[in-house]
Swiss-Prot record:
<dbReference type="InterPro" id="IPR017927">
    <property type="entry name" value="FAD-bd_FR_type"/>
</dbReference>
<feature type="binding site">
    <location>
        <position position="599"/>
    </location>
    <ligand>
        <name>FAD</name>
    </ligand>
</feature>
<keyword id="KW-0028">Amino-acid biosynthesis</keyword>
<feature type="binding site">
    <location>
        <position position="561"/>
    </location>
    <ligand>
        <name>NADP(+)</name>
    </ligand>
</feature>
<keyword id="KW-0274">FAD</keyword>
<dbReference type="GO" id="GO:0005829">
    <property type="term" value="C:cytosol"/>
</dbReference>
<feature type="domain" description="Flavodoxin-like">
    <location>
        <begin position="64"/>
        <end position="202"/>
    </location>
</feature>
<feature type="binding site">
    <location>
        <begin position="386"/>
        <end position="389"/>
    </location>
    <ligand>
        <name>FAD</name>
    </ligand>
</feature>
<dbReference type="GO" id="GO:0019344">
    <property type="term" value="P:cysteine biosynthetic process"/>
</dbReference>
<dbReference type="InterPro" id="IPR003097">
    <property type="entry name" value="CysJ-like_FAD-binding"/>
</dbReference>
<dbReference type="GO" id="GO:0000103">
    <property type="term" value="P:sulfate assimilation"/>
</dbReference>
<comment type="pathway">
    <text>Sulfur metabolism; hydrogen sulfide biosynthesis; hydrogen sulfide from sulfite (NADPH route): step 1/1.</text>
</comment>
<dbReference type="InterPro" id="IPR001433">
    <property type="entry name" value="OxRdtase_FAD/NAD-bd"/>
</dbReference>
<dbReference type="InterPro" id="IPR010199">
    <property type="entry name" value="CysJ"/>
</dbReference>
<dbReference type="InterPro" id="IPR029039">
    <property type="entry name" value="Flavoprotein-like_sf"/>
</dbReference>
<keyword id="KW-0198">Cysteine biosynthesis</keyword>
<dbReference type="Pfam" id="PF00258">
    <property type="entry name" value="Flavodoxin_1"/>
</dbReference>
Length: 599
């Protein structure tokens, strides 16, 4: 287990002290880490000044609860920053991860703040699914004594923009809650909106919440576990790419790469279940094509975050070029008065369809216009890092991190196009080349604390990545618990990712069972959800034996189909109706026995 400092905080340790602390705690169990935390707290509080302080009972200080519901870490960072702002204002605040929130307590909340992102087709983040389901159930209590505010993060390139935040906001009001502030829906470039909203929240709460004594101004909850690393999304580690290996066959329709990155002596730590954030640069050839289509030269000066840069450099390093959005299409149409695009303006569905099927460079190619450099920059969104599920355990690979990358490649009317980050890693970073990375910790996708607990892993395609990390960790720990893998892809001969490794784990007895679904090797398509139904009786036995279930991969189709198959298995072999099966699976989620890493 690792410990986590809010990204905005400055570590009070020098690199040598940090390395010693990490070395001393790297092999401790969660229970041992909790004891060590208490031990150091006790040492600190043996100081005379501390002994003299007598804090008032917490029960006398009804305060503010912040619920963080994050998928990629952005919502968590906003929640942590708000927590810090409220502490600075001497307000009593508790910050809790949505997955750890005892949602039956919600009726007793007086001041409630929800910071949430949205995933998939307007769904809440994985860690907030149980809370969301509870609030929308008949069990949800009235909240007449609760004042609340919601900050929602989303991406306007998706149809259900900020839907999770809209859901929480409307439901809390419907249950009788009082809005402290109107909901804020923030797009990808959320920082300015978040900063303004945080200031408004602090002002609104100062008049409602009691000021806490210094000893009471503390935040609790899983969000506040400390991950000791000086590296973050905003301060990434410059690492080097050491291995770039294609692991699909020459006749495969997919290009999947096994990527290994050398972390050197950085001390960067991660756990199985975490994600690797990768900052990439756009393809110079794509930048050149876009610039020339707009009759620009590329050396025009533009302003980016207060700095003056040549247009080419700004486009390569700072702006999103490979993902189009409805807003970009609409703004480009209005700006250029394009006869092709103007009819789409005002029709959300048509704009979204066009954006989803037409990259920015092809939009310009099909509807040419002349823009000045600043107008182009103002049209685009800032470049954001991509997250990849980590496919390794440091118990085996030490100062390396591995990821499994499905390279996005497609044609648009004869022009080859590719994904920004995936093609950067696959095509443009040379061996030993620099890659800027950071760890996005995911405490909602963790191996069981008890090594004897059985594990069921469901991961078709590149969803196999975290389970490679899981197996490395289980093997290194010599964990006696059983392990069962469900994997699927189009063809056995071309698409069996990490085949030799899985076969070795089976031979060594580490992988107890493996079920494989090859969707294109026979007339009828077979998927992992079909294998789940086929093995329903045994699956139910494992669940009854306390197994933890993990799902990784596509959120929109696979994860939903897998969940439906699990519900059917639970209903059939558990003798339950549909409603009871759904309740059973929800309880597994609350108990952290059903965890998903979907995207």
């Amino acid at each position: 287990m690792t410990t986590q400092v809010p990204p905005s905080a400055l570590l009070p340790l020098n690199p040598e002290q940090l390395a010693r602390l990490q070395a001393a705690t790297t092999d401790l169990t969660p229970t041992q880490l909790a004891w060590v935390s208490g031990y150091f707290w006790g040492v600190l509080n043996q100081q005379p000044a501390a002994l003299a302080a007598t804090p008032a009972p917490a029960a006398e200080m009804p305060g503010i609860t912040i619920i963080s519901a994050s998928q990629t870490g952005n919502a968590r960072r906003v929640a942590e920053a708000l927590r810090d702002d409220l502490l600075a204002a001497k307000l009593n605040v508790k910050l809790v991860n949505a997955g750890d929130y005892k949602f039956k307590q919600i009726a007793s909340e007086k001041l409630l703040i929800v910071v949430t992102s949205t995933q998939g087709e307007g769904e809440p983040p994985e860690e907030a699914v149980a809370l969301h389901k509870f609030l929308f159930s008949k069990k949800a209590p009235k909240l007449e004594n609760t004042a609340f505010a919601v900050f929602s993060l989303g991406d306007s390139s998706y149809e259900f923009f900020c839907q999770s935040g809209k859901d929480f906001d409307s439901k809390l009001a419907e249950l009788g809650g009082e809005r402290l502030l109107d909901r804020v829906d923030a797009d990808v470039e959320y920082q300015a909106a978040a900063s303004e909203w945080r200031a408004r929240v602090v002002d609104a709460l100062k008049s409602r919440a009691p000021v806490a004594a210094p000893s009471q101004s503390v935040a609790t909850g899983a969000v506040n576990e400390i991950h000791t690393s000086p590296y973050s999304k905003d301060a990434p580690l410059v690492a080097s790419l050491s291995v770039n290996q294609k692991i699909t066959g020459r006749n495969s329709e997919k290009d999947v790469r096994h990527i290994e990155i050398d972390l050197g002596d950085s001390g960067l730590r991660y756990q199985p279940g975490d994600a690797l954030g990768v900052w990439y640069q756009n393809d110079p050839a794509l930048v050149k094509e876009l610039v020339e289509l707009l009759w620009l030269k590329g050396d025009e000066p533009v302003t980016v975050e207060g700095k003056t840069l040549p247009l080419n450099e700004a486009l390569q390093w700072h702006f999103e070029l490979t993902v189009n959005t409805a807003n970009i299409v609409e703004n480009y149409a209005t700006l250029t008065r394009s006869e092709t695009l103007l009819p789409l303006v005002g029709d959300k569905a048509k704009l979204q369809h066009y954006a989803a099927t037409t990259p920015i460079v092809d939009m310009v190619r099909f509807s040419p216009a002349q823009l000045d450099a600043e107008a182009l920059i103002n049209l685009l969104r800032p470049l954001t890092p991509r997250l990849y599920s980590i496919a390794s355990s440091q118990a085996e690979v030490e100062n390396e991190v591995h990821v499994t990358v499905g390279v996005v490649r497609y044609d648009v009317e004869g022009r080859a196009r590719a994904g920004g980050a995936s093609s950067f890693l696959a095509d443009r970073v040379e061996e030993e080349g620099e890659v800027r990375v950071f760890i996005e910790h995911n405490d909602n996708f963790r191996l069981p604390a008890n090594p004897e607990t059985p594990v069921i892993m469901i991961g078709p395609g590149t969803g196999i990545a975290p389970f490679r990390a899981f197996m490395q960790q289980r093997a290194a720990d010599e964990a006696p618990g059983k392990n069962w893998l469900f994997f699927g892809n189009p063809h056995f001969t071309e698409d069996f990712l990490y085949q030799v490794e899985w076969q070795r784990y089976v031979k060594d007895g580490v992988l107890t069972r493996i079920d494989l679904a090859w969707s294109r090797d026979q007339k009828e398509k077979v998927y992992v959800q079909d294998k789940l139904r086929e093995q329903g009786a045994e699956l139910w036995r494992w669940i009854n034996d306390g197994a933890h279930i993990y799902v990784c991969g596509d959120a929109n189709r696979m994860a939903k189909d897998v969940e439906q198959a699990l519900l059917e298995v639970i209903a059939e072999f558990g003798g339950m109706d549909t409603e009871a099966a759904d309740e059973f699976l929800s309880e597994l989620r609350v108990e952290r026995r059903y965890q998903r890493d979907v995207y």
